Amino acid sequence: NWLRTANNKRIKRIMAYSTIPKSSSYFNTKLWTGNSTNSTAITGVGFQPDMVWIKNRSTTDNHAIFDAIRGATYRIASNATTANTQATNSLASFDSDGFTLNDGGDANGNGENIVGWNWKANGQGSSNTDGSINTTYTSANTTSGCSIITYTGTGANATIGHGLGKVPTFIIFRRYAQAENWNVYHQSLGAAKSLRLNETGAEANDTTALNSTAPTSSLISLGSSVNTNASGNPMIAWCFSDVQGFSKAGSYTGNGNADGTFVYTGFKPAFIMIKNSSSSSDWAMFDNKRQGYNVANNLLYPNNTTADTTGTFLDLLSNGFKMRTTASWSNENGATYTY
């Protein structure tokens, strides 16, 4: 990535709109075909992931989320309320260039097409003592704006440290040792409303999730909600902040037209998750590998088990994305969407 000046000097091209020289060193989508064989190495991720979200694209298996804090063999499903479970037949280890799978069908079904979204945080991390609750582990990557936090809830107003050094704009919470709904904070909704990742519902008033207090550059406020701060229960929060040229959480208004709304991000997205916050609809997930060309970018739903869906959905552009459908989950006229 070099260029030459008028006097023939060779200089490195710096992309002014990005603070991360190589975004694929912090997030990458990996596709593979399962073989139902133990100790199958999935390589080419480009880094050792600290969070891996897997979905079997060919079947109606659950989504499976793994991270370095809970341990590689423990999975939890975004589409369900079931508790964190150990699945030794699924993901076996996080490796320097990817991960290893055993023979389980959700991640390695024979002949089945599977996707894994990979994020780099900071390994297992360590306890963060910035808040009134000392976290068990905070795995924070200040470069990519990704932090994974585990802590024990108190059931009363409290704070926890996220370690990012900048304000999180999107946070997914879960009481993971018991059956429970997922709770999602999004900056465009404010701290007194939330969404549920496992459900289709619109935004809802929720003053007890974050105690109606927006996150700061160091702390997340918690209220008494069992979804974010259940007394005596292990909790987890996956936190993301905006990073110029790499990640962004925002909102847009649908226009109900196949020549849909254009959403400016300032960079070409590699992963998009959308929710209609105005009314009931599925969540929607896209990436730059399934199919990887416009307009046929495949669709998955994090709130249900539906297999990969093909169709005319959206364009991934150099500076954002553009909707190409009038579906309620993406471009209903006048509806507000979070991404």
Give the positions of each predicted feature.
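Surface-exposed molecular-recognition determinants
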Residues: 2-4, 10-339
